[in-house]
Curated annotation (Swiss-Prot):
Subunit of the oligosaccharyl transferase (OST) complex that catalyzes the initial transfer of a defined glycan (Glc(3)Man(9)GlcNAc(2) in eukaryotes) from the lipid carrier dolichol-pyrophosphate to an asparagine residue within an Asn-X-Ser/Thr consensus motif in nascent polypeptide chains, the first step in protein N-glycosylation. N-glycosylation occurs cotranslationally and the complex associates with the Sec61 complex at the channel-forming translocon complex that mediates protein translocation across the endoplasmic reticulum (ER). All subunits are required for a maximal enzyme activity. This is Dolichyl-diphosphooligosaccharide--protein glycosyltransferase subunit 4. Residues 30-40 are cytoplasmic. The chain crosses the membrane at residues 7-29. It is a single-pass type III membrane protein. The gene is ost4.
Length: 40
């Protein structure tokens, strides 16, 4: 079975990864919108 320590490490790693992906997504989406406005 999975121990409490392993579960804690897994959940913290997944949470941090998802958080960073969301921040990266917002950065890319904002940069794309800004670039599209400059082209017009």
């Amino acid at each position: 079975m999975i121990t409490d320590t392993q579960l804690t490490l897994l959940s913290n790693t997944l949470g941090a990864t998802i958080f960073l992906l969301i921040v990266y997504y917002h950065y890319v989406a904002t940069k794309t919108v800004t670039a599209a406005k400059k082209d017009n």
